[in-house]
Swiss-Prot record:
IF-3 binds to the 30S ribosomal subunit and shifts the equilibrium between 70S ribosomes and their 50S and 30S subunits in favor of the free subunits, thus enhancing the availability of 30S subunits on which protein synthesis initiation begins. It is found in: Cytoplasm. GO terms for molecular function: ribosome binding; translation initiation factor activity. It comes from Pseudomonas putida (strain ATCC 47054 / DSM 6125 / CFBP 8728 / NCIMB 11950 / KT2440). Monomer. GO terms for biological process: ribosome disassembly. One of its GO terms (cellular component) is cytosol. Its main location: cytoplasm. Gene3D superfamilies: Translation initiation factor 3 (IF-3), C-terminal domain, Translation initiation factor 3 (IF-3), N-terminal domain. InterPro entries: T_IF-3_C_sf, T_IF-3_N_sf, Translation_initiation_fac_3, Translation_initiation_fac_3_C, Translation_initiation_fac_3_N. Keywords: Cytoplasm, Initiation factor, Protein biosynthesis. This is Translation initiation factor IF-3. Belongs to the IF-3 family. It comes from the Bacteria.
């Protein structure tokens, strides 16, 4: 006994256009195999032309009146479309936001390490979110936090630009720096 398995839903699949006998229109605007426009012909005539060329009749635009069909190799057409979709996906880069946390009393050694990480994030093309958390009585000296963020902004001026200026959110001071565009 064989078990019928359902085909998985492939997100990369190109939507299939009606071809050959599956085209429901009576007459179509035909484009030949070499790209020249043949004109408006009956579906039987278009199928005969495609059959003579040993190619498929593919419906390109169903919304047009009459629908536009082209004589082409459908398998090759699907392959090219899938290839283009993969290329577009490969060339896409997703920008992430990386966060570094400071404190008002961050010492110079720790500051340098965190600054190196921020430089690495920005050169990799990611945005950097700098958060400075105040505890207890430190809230009374928010100007120390502002000075620290101004120092960070000055040190990172050659690597990025401030996208969101320092802003208080509860007990945290936040700032977002975006990488500079590469030429």
């Amino acid at each position: 006994m064989t078990i019928k398995r359902e085909m998985r839903n492939d997100k990369r699949a190109v939507p299939k256009a009606p071809i050959n006998e599956n085209i429901s229109a009576r007459e179509v605007r035909l484009i030949g195999a070499d790209g020249e426009q043949v004109g408006i012909v009956s579906i039987d005539e278009a199928l005969r032309i495609a059959d003579e060329a040993k190619l498929d009749l593919v419906e390109i635009s169903a919304d047009a009146v009459p629908p536009v069909c082209k004589v082409m190799d459908y398998g090759k057409h699907l392959f090219e479309k899938k290839k283009q979709a993969n290329e577009a996906k490969k060339n896409q880069k997703q920008i992430q936001i990386k966060e570094i946390k400071f404190r008002p009393g961050t010492e110079d050694g720790d500051y340098q390490v965190k600054l190196r990480n921020l430089v690495r994030f920005l050169t990799d093309g990611d945005k950097a979110k700098i958060s400075l958390r105040f505890r207890g009585r430190e809230m009374a000296h928010q100007e120390l936090g502002m000075e620290l963020l101004k120092r960070v902004e000055a040190d990172l001026a050659e690597y990025g630009t401030v996208e969101q200026h320092p802003k208080m959110e509860g007990r945290q001071l936040m700032m977002v720096i975006a990488p500079k565009k590469k030429k």
